[in-house]
């Protein structure tokens, strides 16, 4: 199951649920954007495999079935720390490997993540060729929480 923090209107959730047939949970804090995601779910082919929750990341209890997490630089470093604490708490209670995907991460995110002892850096995918401008943040950085 994929957990998408700051899911917006649900595009990533719908796409990945359709392409990989995974279940997805989108967490959104803004009630107006959440309403759009719920509206989009009605028309999405993969809507039955997607769930949206109106909640702040730091208060969302991570379900035991979550094994993939996607972040599109959704919130401040302070909130990331709290969300990571929730993820780690879920892993302590129900040991499992979780892969974390950070798209367009800030330097502050990477600096913090490199200091979390439970995280292991897995890979970095350069995405600078997708858009003009050569933005070095156009990348996906992957970490894992080991069982």
PLM feature spans:
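A short SAM/SAH-binding and catalytic strip from SAM-dependent methyltransferases
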Residues: 68-79
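Conserved class I S-adenosyl-L-methionine
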Residues: 1-8
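Gly/Ala-rich phosphate-binding loop of Rossmann-like dinucleotide-binding domains
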Residues: 17-18
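Conserved short alpha-helix immediately C-terminal to the canonical SAM/SAH-binding motif I
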Residues: 32-33
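S-adenosyl-L-methionine
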Residues: 36-63
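C-terminal substrate-binding/active-site "lid" region of AdoMet-derived donor-dependent transferases
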Residues: 78-139
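Conserved SAM-binding motif I beta-strand of class I
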Residues: 23-28
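Glycine-rich SAM-binding Motif I of class I
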Residues: 10-14
């Amino acid at each position: 199951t994929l957990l998408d923090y700051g899911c917006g209107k649900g595009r990533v959730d719908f796409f990945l649920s359709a392409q990989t047939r995974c279940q997805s949970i989108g967490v959104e804090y803004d009630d107006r954007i959440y309403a759009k995601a719920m509206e989009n779910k009605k028309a999405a082919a993969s809507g039955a495999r997607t769930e949206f929750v109106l909640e702040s990341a730091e208060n969302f209890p991570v379900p035991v079935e979550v094994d993939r997490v996607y972040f599109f630089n959704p919130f401040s470093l302070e909130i990331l720390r709290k969300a990571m604490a929730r993820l780690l708490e879920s892993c302590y209670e129900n040991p499992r490997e979780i892969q974390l995907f950070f798209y367009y991460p800030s330097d502050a995110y990477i600096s913090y993540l490199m200091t979390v002892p439970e995280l292991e850096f897995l890979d970095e995918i350069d995405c600078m060729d997708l858009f003009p401008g050569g933005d070095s943040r156009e990348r996906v950085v992957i970490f894992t929480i080991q069982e």
